[in-house]
């Protein structure tokens, strides 16, 4: 029997990332993957308003429609890149559309997907508080904010009696460790749990790409921002070193990448940290969950 690392060792929980749902993953496969994920004892799903023109949320709404809402945790994100700002009208408009797509009256976590330099953060947080009081979300999350911004946000929320963020979703893997320097100490101090996205560096750590010239159809062709983030010579050089070490120790690069996150990174089950697991098909999902 495969050892389920996420449940039986450090207990770093997996969260099913749905960025591929509605693009590389059709509705039938979305349902299968969601059901399989839950059958393995996991119950947390992560989506966003911007994922695939709303189809990720629509598919999740259909996949979860017959399941008791108390049996799963559902997160979505509002994004300033849609309207150019995160004020009350923009957040409300996006969230109402998301709730309709997701076929629910409330999400467990509402993330601010990216910082909005055009709207004072006080205004954004006041808007979140008003929406929270209406019962449309249970927890406030942050994603892609700096350590300094997190400190400021927590201070504003504390001083005004507004719901403070309880979860932070950030880029983290064996190749990208910037968050360890400033962000992690801040979120530990403020009692915020951390969810790591891109655990396989968008696929670079899957072993699928051998060089900077080896791009094939997938995330790097479908999402240009991923190519900008990872398609660099230094990443490929690092992967070659890791692959050599993995080969010498009879372990796959994917397994080593997840084992590093679970056993040797800053993630810690006592803080209820998690790893966003994104997959393009059910076989990849099972593989990523069963090393």
Where are these regions (language model features)?
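Structural preference for beta-strand elements that scaffold enzyme active sites
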Residues: 11-15, 43-44, 71-77, 106-111, ...
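Active-site beta-loop-alpha junctions enriched in small/polar residues
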Residues: 19-21, 48-50, 77-81, 112-115, ...
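Glycine/proline-rich, positively charged
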Residues: 25, 35, 83-178, 182, ...
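Glycine-rich, positively charged active-site loop/lid region within alpha/beta enzyme cores that binds
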Residues: 14, 188-245, 270
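Conserved short secondary-structure transition element at the edge of the structured enzyme core
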Residues: 228-291
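Conserved, mostly hydrophobic/aromatic
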Residues: 16, 45, 60, 74, ...
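N-terminal binding-site loop/beta-alpha segment at the start of enzyme catalytic domains
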Residues: 2-72, 133
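Short, hinge-like loop/turn segments at secondary-structure boundaries
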Residues: 63-64, 93, 157-161, 184-186, ...
């Amino acid at each position: 029997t495969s050892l389920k690392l996420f449940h039986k060792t450090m207990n770093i929980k997996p969260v099913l990332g749905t960025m591929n749902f509605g693009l590389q993953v059709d509705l039938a496969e979305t349902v299968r993957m969601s059901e399989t994920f839950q059958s393995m004892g996991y119950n947390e799903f992560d989506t966003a308003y911007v994922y695939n023109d709303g189809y990720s949320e629509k598919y999740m709404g259909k996949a979860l429609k017959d399941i008791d809402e108390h049996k799963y945790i559902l997160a979505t994100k509002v994004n300033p890149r849609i309207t150019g700002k995160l004020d009350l009208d923009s957040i409300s408009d996006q969230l109402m559309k998301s709730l309709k797509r997701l076929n629910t009256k409330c999400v467990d976590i509402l993330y601010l997907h990216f910082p909005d330099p055009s709207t004072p953060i006080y205004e954004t947080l006041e808007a979140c508080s008003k929406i929270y009081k209406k019962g449309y979300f249970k927890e406030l999350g942050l994603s892609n904010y700096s350590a300094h911004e997190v400190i400021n946000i927590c201070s504003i929320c504390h001083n005004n009696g507004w719901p403070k963020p309880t979860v932070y979703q950030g880029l983290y893997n064996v190749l990208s460790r910037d968050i360890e320097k400033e962000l992690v100490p801040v979120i530990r101090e403020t009692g915020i749990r951390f969810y790591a996205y891109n655990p396989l560096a968008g696929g670079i750590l899957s072993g699928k790409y051998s060089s900077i010239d080896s791009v094939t159809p997938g995330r790097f062709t479908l999402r240009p921002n991923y190519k900008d983030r990872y398609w660099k010579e230094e990443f490929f050089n690092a992967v070659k070193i890791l692959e050599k070490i993995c080969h010498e120790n009879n372990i796959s690069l994917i397994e080593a990448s997840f084992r590093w996150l679970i056993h040797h990174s800053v993630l810690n089950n006592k803080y209820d940290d998690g790893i966003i697991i994104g997959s393009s098909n059910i076989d990849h999902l099972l593989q990523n969950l069963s090393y």
